[in-house]
Amino acid sequence: MAGLDPTLSTSHPFYDVARHGILQVAGDDRQGRRIFTFSCCRLPPLHQLNHQRLLEYLKYTLDQHVENDYTIVYFHYGLSSQNKPSLGWLQNTYKEFDRKYKKNLKALYVVHPTSLIKALWNIFKPLISHKFGKKVTYCSNLRELREHLQCDQLLIPPEVVRYDEKLQNLHKGQPPPPTKTPPPRPPLPTQQFGVSLQYLRDKNQGELIPPVLRWTVTYLREKGLRTEGLFRRSASAQTVRQVQRLYDQGKPVNFDDYGDMHLPAVILKTFLRELPQPLLTFQAYEQILGITSVESSLRVTHCRLILRSLPEHNYAVLRYLMGFLHEVSLESISNKMNSSNLACVFGLNLIWPSQGVASLSALVPLNLFTELLIEYYDKVFSCQEAPGEHTRDTVEVQQAGPVTKEFMKTGTPRASPYLSRLRIS
């Protein structure tokens, strides 16, 4: 069956709905917002799907992400009288998705809209707020969608791709000239985004921690640890690109000038997401997916075994980042970002498959693995120390407060309240 997720377990509470692949997670957009795709062509005939269960499944899935900003891509092709939900169901669904769902939905792309969509929009217009309506973008074809999103990240059903090609063939007149892709240019010596960790090390006197990572972590540690929703909110796409250009050109960035504590957080996530290979490496992906099958008391030990296979450089950067995120989690009373919430944000920024994107069911082990690294930071990273890591922060240690000094010198932040309850191997 098209869209069937090979990693989906039959024990999934909504296996009867999830197996159709109607709703998929599709990585992040350019602003770091999680993308979901809803494909009408994967809706089975009415008699084969309980639409109340579909609604419950949608809420169950989105509930895991709606505290963060997110984007939805709706592929309309494939909706027919055989699988089309009733107007009553649509109206009830809109009411069921209350403010928490609508507030953090930042963009809704409707692909291949028809007159039916426009008619439905007129019907529901009295119920839809003007603010929500501004989030909707119509895309007549996939080419228009590519102007907004990186479609190579999306799980676009083959049926939708074929339909789009058919539309293009039916288009009258001269086809648009083929787009000429300029040859790739070598990165700048000061480039920070889209280059490998090795490149950054070579261009920065052997420093293991990439400059942009160090700068953003230092700023957030000093001024942003108690910011509510840290790493959950997005920032202006234009501002993010501007800051990226400044960093890539080797120019200084003063985040105080922007007045948005979420901006350095987005820059940090963007840096991780644009690495040519994920920080946890493609090779570790399948091992990480197996974390849920490991006995709970042995999971931290299993995490340490997986990390042993990482290149030294990746391990050093990961240890530095996880130590900081552990500090963030210790301020969760103020920032509302405990280790579980941070894991939901960072899971797909640390690891993704070499081909395609992670499925919805893969998010569970990926996020669990990330949560273990953050919550049990001391135990996971206690037996390995990347050579040279303790020497890079001398200046920062001299200028930092006692908590930061302890972390910089020992690699161990303040004792976690979670660790007092830890009874694992």
Swiss-Prot record:
GO terms for molecular function: GTPase activator activity. Highly expressed in skeletal muscle, lung and testis, and at lower levels in kidney, stomach and colon. Not detected in heart, liver, spleen, breast, brain, neonatal head or pancreas. InterPro entries: CRAL-TRIO_dom, CRAL-TRIO_dom_sf, Rho_GTPase_activation_prot, RhoGAP_dom. Residues 174-189 have a biased composition (Pro residues). The keyword Glycoprotein does not apply. SMART domains: RhoGAP, SEC14. Residues 169-192 are annotated as: Disordered. Keywords: GTPase activation. Residues 195-381 form the Rho-GAP domain. Residues 13-168 form the CRAL-TRIO domain. The record marks R232 as: Arginine finger. CDD domains: SEC14. GO terms for biological process: positive regulation of ERK1 and ERK2 cascade; signal transduction. Pfam families: CRAL_TRIO_2, RhoGAP. Signal peptide: none annotated. GTPase activator for the Rho-type GTPases by converting them to an inactive GDP-bound state. PANTHER family: RHO GTPASE-ACTIVATING PROTEIN 68F, RHO GTPASE-ACTIVATING PROTEIN 8. This is Rho GTPase-activating protein 8. It comes from Mus musculus. The lineage of its organism: Eukaryota, Metazoa, Chordata, Craniata, Vertebrata.
